[in-house]
């Protein structure tokens, strides 16, 4: 919320690149025999976030994790009986839980299980093997994937193409080789709004600036892509009036 007048183009804050949590800034890339880029933008960031989260106080992003949500009630976490209430809605086919879990178990789960010192088991488990271990691994991966879906930014490179929105799970085949994703501390404090926005940012130093004049007590609204209502519901479980004009008819 603005406390005083803010001019058009005035700098609000700047986030240095090294403060962004990403596959490039995390030390995990130097500890694995795998190339994180092989996992694509979504799964590589999920793996990095699991690693940094499990490091606890040793992670430079520990304070950031403390302000991020730990529990979600978005559609990815609904039970089959709860999802039955949405039968007939197109959103059911866009959740992609099964495909997301298949990708997690086929790609990042072997890395996690092979490196128990980097990824210590949670909840008192001896390992991530077995039914209990697999479920614990899926739970933490879904949590990180949901955080990314709700809060992550695209980190553009000159050679990158524009990234398209995932329609199923956390990643589509078309997304491979496109923009990396990163978690930007402090930027999460800005409300996202598809229409009534007055704050934008410029890569790669994450320079956040106003592009309209502020009056005192006017809230900051971060520029976001215009998304259909079904995708907004899947990511954030909200039905904000700003997105109603972008609903599929």
What are the residue ranges of the model-derived segments?
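Long, positively charged leader/targeting segments at protein N-termini
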Residues: 1-19, 23-27, 66-212, 216-249
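Short peripheral tails and domain-boundary helices/loops at the edges of structured domains
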Residues: 30-57
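Short secondary-structure capping/junction motifs at helix and strand boundaries
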Residues: 57-64
